Structures are given as structure tokens and as C-alpha cells.
Amino acid sequence: MAWPCISRLCCLARRWNQLDRSDVAVPLTLHGYSDLDSEEPGTGGAASRRGQPPAGARDSGRDVPLTQYQRDFGLWTTPAGPKDPPPGRGPGAGGRRGKSSAQSSAPPAPGARGVYVLPIGDADAAAAVTTSYRQEFQAWTGVKPSRSTKTKPARVITTHTSGWDSSPGAGFQVPEVRKKFTPNPSAIFQASAPRILNV
């Protein structure tokens, strides 16, 4: 049999049906299985977690410095309400802002979810000058430099010593290219030139 049975579609379908679905269905917001124990079964997990800050947020009382990754890709939450239209493009003719300014000044609806906003541009230029990656960098010690894979150029031996001839006549010879071979210890015969062996 060329292929094992697991490669057949019927066996694959049977294998996927027998998988433990709890391994696949773990929500991405949980960082450990201890979070599952803290929730009470039967009550809404989303309702109990709504008052808590998101997982990426930090406590203001902590003195732990932010890493460069957290500075670059930190999560800022903004209330999800009606979006402000771009200026000059409000509803109606001529871009008047009669209704749109009233909508944008309204507070967001209670219970609105937070929207993750990525930073645009360089938020703090002072942090970009010296990053934590540069501060934590240590050069590796004890690492050998890699050998170069470049082949050494072959030596070109010319046999003619004539000066600059305008016409390469009978005195012109093609230069010989001799390559220096390294001895091969696994070779049977270490002959410098091909010889005829009497057997």
C-alpha cells in the first residue's frame, strides 16, 4: 500500500470528528486556563468581564516599564459611537454641518464596546530614538565567523612574452588555465597527470 490510511478523506473526516473540540474552541482572549476557573458556569462570561480593562491595558499604579513592542502596538480603546464625518462633507448641499455636529457632540451610547485603534505615525519621537531593543542588545560571544564560499580565482599562465601586437598572428597562443586542486584523501589514485595503467 503506497499511502497510509490517514491520508484518505474518510479517515481524515473520522479523525476530525473525534478531535477534542475544547482544544480548538478556547477563546483567544483567555491567556490561561486559570481564567476559566474564575468564571462561574451559567453566568455570562462576557457580562462579568465587561467592567474589567482589556488584557493589553496596564494598571496605573504599576512601575513596570513598557517594552518597545507595547509602545509601538499598544491598545488604545475609544468608545464606539457614530463616526465623525470628514470636515466639509456633511449631509446636505455645500457641506454644511447642521446635523453632523449635533451627532458628533452626542456622548457615546452606554455599554458601547471599545474599539482598538492602531497608532498613526510616530507618537513619541523621544522613545523612537533609543528603543528598548537597542538598550537590551548584547553581541554574541564565542561565535565563529562563517567560512566564505567564494572560490579562489584560478591562476592564468601566459606563455607568450610579446608586447602589444596589433595582429595576433602565429605567435599568439591561448593562455592555459591551471587550477590548483586540493588532494582528495578518499581517491584511489593520486596521480598528478593522467597515466596509462598496465593492468
UniProtKB/Swiss-Prot annotation:
<feature type="lipid moiety-binding region" description="S-palmitoyl cysteine">
    <location>
        <position position="10"/>
    </location>
</feature>
<feature type="modified residue" description="Phosphoserine">
    <location>
        <position position="167"/>
    </location>
</feature>
<dbReference type="GO" id="GO:0008017">
    <property type="term" value="F:microtubule binding"/>
</dbReference>
<keyword id="KW-0449">Lipoprotein</keyword>
<keyword id="KW-0112">Calmodulin-binding</keyword>
<keyword id="KW-0597">Phosphoprotein</keyword>
<dbReference type="GO" id="GO:0070507">
    <property type="term" value="P:regulation of microtubule cytoskeleton organization"/>
</dbReference>
<dbReference type="GO" id="GO:0005801">
    <property type="term" value="C:cis-Golgi network"/>
</dbReference>
<comment type="function">
    <text>May have microtubule-stabilizing activity.</text>
</comment>
<feature type="modified residue" description="Phosphoserine">
    <location>
        <position position="38"/>
    </location>
</feature>
<dbReference type="GO" id="GO:0005798">
    <property type="term" value="C:Golgi-associated vesicle"/>
</dbReference>
<feature type="region of interest" description="Mn 1">
    <location>
        <begin position="130"/>
        <end position="143"/>
    </location>
</feature>
<keyword id="KW-0206">Cytoskeleton</keyword>
<feature type="lipid moiety-binding region" description="S-palmitoyl cysteine">
    <location>
        <position position="5"/>
    </location>
</feature>
<dbReference type="GO" id="GO:0005516">
    <property type="term" value="F:calmodulin binding"/>
</dbReference>
<comment type="similarity">
    <text>Belongs to the STOP family.</text>
</comment>
<dbReference type="GO" id="GO:0007026">
    <property type="term" value="P:negative regulation of microtubule depolymerization"/>
</dbReference>
<keyword id="KW-0564">Palmitate</keyword>
<comment type="subunit">
    <text>Interacts with calmodulin.</text>
</comment>
<feature type="region of interest" description="Disordered">
    <location>
        <begin position="33"/>
        <end position="110"/>
    </location>
</feature>
<keyword id="KW-0333">Golgi apparatus</keyword>
<keyword id="KW-0963">Cytoplasm</keyword>
<dbReference type="GO" id="GO:0005874">
    <property type="term" value="C:microtubule"/>
</dbReference>
<feature type="region of interest" description="Mn 2">
    <location>
        <begin position="165"/>
        <end position="177"/>
    </location>
</feature>
<protein>
    <recommendedName>
        <fullName>MAP6 domain-containing protein 1</fullName>
    </recommendedName>
</protein>
<dbReference type="InterPro" id="IPR007882">
    <property type="entry name" value="MAP6"/>
</dbReference>
<dbReference type="GO" id="GO:0030705">
    <property type="term" value="P:cytoskeleton-dependent intracellular transport"/>
</dbReference>
<feature type="lipid moiety-binding region" description="S-palmitoyl cysteine">
    <location>
        <position position="11"/>
    </location>
</feature>
<dbReference type="GO" id="GO:0000226">
    <property type="term" value="P:microtubule cytoskeleton organization"/>
</dbReference>
